[in-house]
Amino acid sequence: RLISEKHAVVAERGSVPVGFGTLDVPTGEILQLYVRPDYARHGVGTVIVDELVRVARAAGVRVVHCIASLNARAFYVTVGFDPGQRRKHRLRSGVEVDCVPMKKVLE
């Protein structure tokens, strides 16, 4: 796929990067979301997800979704995502981890 199909957001405090997220625009999938641990619970993740959802909505995407770790489930619920059934997800490394598919229907 072309890089133009992806949208990346970098959150900064001052000039210091504190988090980032990436969205596959055609599918509405949040591919990555990371916030530095020392900035967790300071609204950084919410700002990043809000921007990714805004971009998806502007592109005509109807559903934004992701595969969330069990630790991230509560965060995604807080920002308006609905959880699916817990399942295993195979990482590129081949390791399987427990996860929860999450989705947010855009109005």
Language-model features and meaning:
Residues I67-N71, V79, H89-E107:
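C-terminal "cap" of GNAT-fold acetyltransferases
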Residues R1-D38, V49, V55, L106:
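Acetyl-CoA-dependent GNAT
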Residues A56-S69:
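Conserved GNAT acetyl-CoA-binding A-motif
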Residues R36, A40, I67-S69:
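Residue-level recognition of the GNAT/N-acetyltransferase active site
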Residues H42, T46, D50:
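Residues forming the Rossmann-fold NAD(P)(H) cofactor-binding site
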Residues V9, F20, F75-Y76, F81:
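Conserved hydrophobic/aromatic "anchor" residues
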